[in-house]
Amino acid sequence: MQRIKQGDDVIVTAGKDKGRRGTVVKVLTDDRVVVQNINMVKKHQKPNPTAGQPGGIIDKEMPIHVSNVMLFNPAKGKGDRVGFKTLEDGRKVRYFKSDNEVVDA
């Protein structure tokens, strides 16, 4: 089970976008995540007529390491650490360590 999943709201804890909040768009296998409108770079792209892509300079989201993001706790209004626990029915769920609230209902 992963600490950060697709669709989670996260806060960036390090780097040029420190303190910004966004939603995880994609989780990569090498412990990196792509966060919406975070770590934007300008990419020079050639036109590709077969795929219908125009050329030019485009803004693109680049992945950041999972250690540089924290899951956003809406009850506290800030980032929080995540742990795992097993419920009585045998399900393994994520929870916020500061207030023991379950993330996955």
UniProtKB/Swiss-Prot annotation:
Q: Which Pfam families match?
A: KOW (PF00467), ribosomal_L24 (PF17136)
- GO molecular-function annotation terms? rRNA binding; structural constituent of ribosome
Q: Which residues form a coiled coil?
A: none
Spell out the InterPro entries in the cross-references.
KOW (IPR005824), Rib_uL2_dom2 (IPR014722), Ribosomal_uL24 (IPR003256), Ribosomal_uL24_KOW (IPR041988), Translation_prot_SH3-like_sf (IPR008991)
Q: Which UniProt keywords apply?
A: Ribonucleoprotein, Ribosomal protein, RNA-binding, rRNA-binding
Q: What SUPFAM superfamilies would the database entry show?
A: Translation proteins SH3-like domain
Query: Mind naming one GO cellular-component term on file for this protein?
Result: ribonucleoprotein complex
Q: Which residues cross the membrane?
A: none
Keyword field contains Ligase: no
Please provide the Gene Ontology terms (biological process) for this protein: translation
| Family membership noted in the UniProt record | Belongs to the universal ribosomal protein uL24 family.
Any idea what job this protein has?
One of two assembly initiator proteins, it binds directly to the 5'-end of the 23S rRNA, where it nucleates assembly of the 50S subunit.
Instruction: Read off the NCBIfam families from this record.
Output: rplX_bact (TIGR01079)
- Subunit structure of this entry? Part of the 50S ribosomal subunit.
Please report the name of this protein according to its UniProt entry: Large ribosomal subunit protein uL24
Q: What is the lineage of its organism?
A: Bacteria, Pseudomonadati, Pseudomonadota, Gammaproteobacteria, Chromatiales
